């Protein structure tokens, strides 16, 4: 109860803060980064480099009301085929713009619903990608799989293409909650998809589950987590549902009065967290869990965990190139985002141009602030040695930045000459502590609840 009172006093239950999957966050991107800048950054990638590639497929058969992703519904394959054709054209432009010998350390298909593509289309797209950019040794090819939109033929196509990590969205297994959030997907349908994945020898399975959904209570989320544990995923993301109907209009379908209050959200998170830990998962960052042998767990132990748009990653590539509408690329120089609207993106590609419409070029200050935020989000610690060595700080200048944070959060953090650490009892405040290192105006955009 004392911890709850402290968390409340520090504003956890009222705050809205970024998830910090990037810094600066996407609302601060500007049109100053367009296609010419994107081409310059692509040209700077050295020959033979290993990069990551993300391909966005923005289509779904149905629109889930809880989802805030850039997606659109279609009952026909024709828009998907036209989009896949544009992906191939964009891929060809990218290959022409890059130095020779570039390989992939990670290939990820997300959406939307990538498994909406028919099997022959999957083979065509995967073949084109791997012809252009072979997989590096130890590379990971992952795809977001909708259990409602997968069959044997499509799973065969993915397995033959080299899929070695599958990701499925669960959200919640309670039928009443599923109906309210517009995502009906039974445990049996989900298990069938998992069995198809395992039967083909696909080594790793990710799953997403949400807390903070309408009518969720500790008993209901415990039942959903126990069903998920029966499927034995290697990695789990336990995300807080972000109710932002002013940004994601479809969320108006979800009754806000049925949502748990912030104290209830924390109880839901803690209930699920305790079950994952009891089942032998390692806790990764603020909201992920992984089997001890999973790459995320190994990266965390080695101090190599990183933050990206999917949450947490063990990918060490310096460049992530995003293909498709709304995709965001990350370079050592900054971020570049494609046109969010599918039509605008396709028009640019048809004209033989990349669709980069906005982004952000890093300043020196962005770099150290970004690294401090990432260090807190991944390791719950800012090490003074790193920032003195890599970012030009001395002990006094670093202390001027860390001391006010330590004073504000009291015994939720420890601070001394070696740096600043978030204590275990302070970890629910991690995003709020990270916000203290954010140099941008929080009022410029809306964000999700801090818990």
From Swiss-Prot:
<feature type="binding site">
    <location>
        <position position="328"/>
    </location>
    <ligand>
        <name>S-adenosyl-L-methionine 1</name>
    </ligand>
</feature>
<keyword id="KW-0479">Metal-binding</keyword>
<keyword id="KW-0963">Cytoplasm</keyword>
<feature type="binding site">
    <location>
        <position position="60"/>
    </location>
    <ligand>
        <name>[4Fe-4S] cluster</name>
    </ligand>
</feature>
<dbReference type="GO" id="GO:0051989">
    <property type="term" value="F:coproporphyrinogen dehydrogenase activity"/>
</dbReference>
<dbReference type="InterPro" id="IPR007197">
    <property type="entry name" value="rSAM"/>
</dbReference>
<feature type="binding site">
    <location>
        <begin position="112"/>
        <end position="113"/>
    </location>
    <ligand>
        <name>S-adenosyl-L-methionine 2</name>
    </ligand>
</feature>
<feature type="binding site">
    <location>
        <position position="66"/>
    </location>
    <ligand>
        <name>S-adenosyl-L-methionine 2</name>
    </ligand>
</feature>
<dbReference type="Pfam" id="PF04055">
    <property type="entry name" value="Radical_SAM"/>
</dbReference>
<dbReference type="InterPro" id="IPR006638">
    <property type="entry name" value="Elp3/MiaA/NifB-like_rSAM"/>
</dbReference>
<comment type="function">
    <text>Involved in the heme biosynthesis. Catalyzes the anaerobic oxidative decarboxylation of propionate groups of rings A and B of coproporphyrinogen III to yield the vinyl groups in protoporphyrinogen IX.</text>
</comment>
<comment type="pathway">
    <text>Porphyrin-containing compound metabolism; protoporphyrin-IX biosynthesis; protoporphyrinogen-IX from coproporphyrinogen-III (AdoMet route): step 1/1.</text>
</comment>
<feature type="binding site">
    <location>
        <position position="208"/>
    </location>
    <ligand>
        <name>S-adenosyl-L-methionine 2</name>
    </ligand>
</feature>
<comment type="similarity">
    <text>Belongs to the anaerobic coproporphyrinogen-III oxidase family.</text>
</comment>
<keyword id="KW-0627">Porphyrin biosynthesis</keyword>
<keyword id="KW-0560">Oxidoreductase</keyword>
<feature type="binding site">
    <location>
        <position position="183"/>
    </location>
    <ligand>
        <name>S-adenosyl-L-methionine 2</name>
    </ligand>
</feature>
<feature type="binding site">
    <location>
        <position position="64"/>
    </location>
    <ligand>
        <name>[4Fe-4S] cluster</name>
    </ligand>
</feature>
<dbReference type="GO" id="GO:0006782">
    <property type="term" value="P:protoporphyrinogen IX biosynthetic process"/>
</dbReference>
<dbReference type="InterPro" id="IPR013785">
    <property type="entry name" value="Aldolase_TIM"/>
</dbReference>
<dbReference type="GO" id="GO:0005737">
    <property type="term" value="C:cytoplasm"/>
</dbReference>
<dbReference type="GO" id="GO:0004109">
    <property type="term" value="F:coproporphyrinogen oxidase activity"/>
</dbReference>
<feature type="binding site">
    <location>
        <position position="242"/>
    </location>
    <ligand>
        <name>S-adenosyl-L-methionine 2</name>
    </ligand>
</feature>
<feature type="binding site">
    <location>
        <position position="67"/>
    </location>
    <ligand>
        <name>[4Fe-4S] cluster</name>
    </ligand>
</feature>
<dbReference type="InterPro" id="IPR034505">
    <property type="entry name" value="Coproporphyrinogen-III_oxidase"/>
</dbReference>
<keyword id="KW-0949">S-adenosyl-L-methionine</keyword>
<dbReference type="GO" id="GO:0051539">
    <property type="term" value="F:4 iron, 4 sulfur cluster binding"/>
</dbReference>
<keyword id="KW-0411">Iron-sulfur</keyword>
<feature type="binding site">
    <location>
        <position position="144"/>
    </location>
    <ligand>
        <name>S-adenosyl-L-methionine 1</name>
    </ligand>
</feature>
<dbReference type="GO" id="GO:0046872">
    <property type="term" value="F:metal ion binding"/>
</dbReference>
<feature type="binding site">
    <location>
        <position position="171"/>
    </location>
    <ligand>
        <name>S-adenosyl-L-methionine 2</name>
    </ligand>
</feature>
<feature type="binding site">
    <location>
        <position position="111"/>
    </location>
    <ligand>
        <name>S-adenosyl-L-methionine 1</name>
    </ligand>
</feature>
<feature type="binding site">
    <location>
        <position position="54"/>
    </location>
    <ligand>
        <name>S-adenosyl-L-methionine 1</name>
    </ligand>
</feature>
<comment type="subunit">
    <text>Monomer.</text>
</comment>
<feature type="domain" description="Radical SAM core">
    <location>
        <begin position="45"/>
        <end position="278"/>
    </location>
</feature>
<dbReference type="InterPro" id="IPR004558">
    <property type="entry name" value="Coprogen_oxidase_HemN"/>
</dbReference>
<dbReference type="GO" id="GO:0006779">
    <property type="term" value="P:porphyrin-containing compound biosynthetic process"/>
</dbReference>
<keyword id="KW-0408">Iron</keyword>
<keyword id="KW-0004">4Fe-4S</keyword>
<protein>
    <recommendedName>
        <fullName>Oxygen-independent coproporphyrinogen III oxidase</fullName>
        <ecNumber>1.3.98.3</ecNumber>
    </recommendedName>
</protein>
